[in-house]
Amino acid sequence: MAVFKGITPEQIESLSSGLHAGVDEVGRGPLVGNVVTAAVILDPNNPITGLNDSKKLTEKKRELLFAEIHEKALCINVGHATPDEIDELNILHATMLAMQRAVAGLDIKPLSVLVDGNRTPAFYHGEETEDRIEAHAVVKGDGLISAISAASIIAKVIRDREMDLLDMEYPQYGFAKHKGYPTKAHFEALELHGVLPEHRKSFRPVKERLAKR
């Protein structure tokens, strides 16, 4: 595993060209819902301007780029890990599993996988579990590597939409506003309305609420 802490412009250019899959996750911190990952292979001949870490973009800009990425990217796939898997494996290992699912489901086998952060799981393409794909962890890669930026945008928009749907089902929890993160409003809703099947039972605030039954 390579960790590019002081990545050079030359490395960025090299890793941003060719059929490299960028991978990022959204949703490790929330108390509810899936952790969502995305794998994106961009078309070097059809660049997208304005890509950046999804957290640094407005919702409107993310939605516009989400559509453009789907229009121009060579390949996109999304992976999930459920609340039950998060509770069983822990959030780190569940996130790694979701990343593996995102890469395994790509229609194109990438030359390598570039993951935002400081660690990466083993990646394989489809059912070819003997054919391991080279992978690199890139610290702050969502602001450095276009494919990782694209993956962060895809994962963020998908998860936000999932929270909007959950909000329609349980409007009293305010998921459309706080997206499941541990905010004061979420704590108050937990206390007042209780734990939902979609909550992560291993996370402390949820576990403490369950203990009050």
UniProtKB/Swiss-Prot annotation:
Binding annotation for a divalent metal cation: 24-25, 116
Gene Ontology terms: cellular component: cytoplasm; ribonuclease H2 complex
Cited InterPro entries: RNase_HII, RNase_HII/HIII, RNase_HII/HIII_dom, RNaseH-like_sf, RNaseH_sf
SUPFAM superfamilies: Ribonuclease H-like
Domain RNase H type-2: 18-213
Entry's localization field: Cytoplasm
Top-level taxon: Bacteria
Swiss-Prot/TrEMBL GO biological process terms: DNA replication, removal of RNA primer; mismatch repair
PROSITE patterns, per database record: RNASE_H_2 (PS51975)
GO molecular function: manganese ion binding; RNA binding; RNA-DNA hybrid ribonuclease activity
Main location, first listed in the record: cytoplasm
Assigned EC number: 3.1.26.4
Catalytic activity: Endonucleolytic cleavage to 5'-phosphomonoester
Annotated keywords: Cytoplasm, Endonuclease, Hydrolase, Manganese, Metal-binding, Nuclease
Cofactor, how bound (note): Manganese or magnesium. Binds 1 divalent metal ion per monomer in the absence of substrate. May bind a second metal ion after substrate binding.
CDD domains referenced in this protein's UniProt entry, alphabetically: RNase_HII_bacteria_HII_like
Named cofactor requirement(s): Mn(2+); Mg(2+)
Purpose: Endonuclease that specifically degrades the RNA of RNA-DNA hybrids.
HAMAP family attached to this UniProt entry: RNase_HII_B
Family, per entry: Belongs to the RNase HII family.
Protein name: Ribonuclease HII
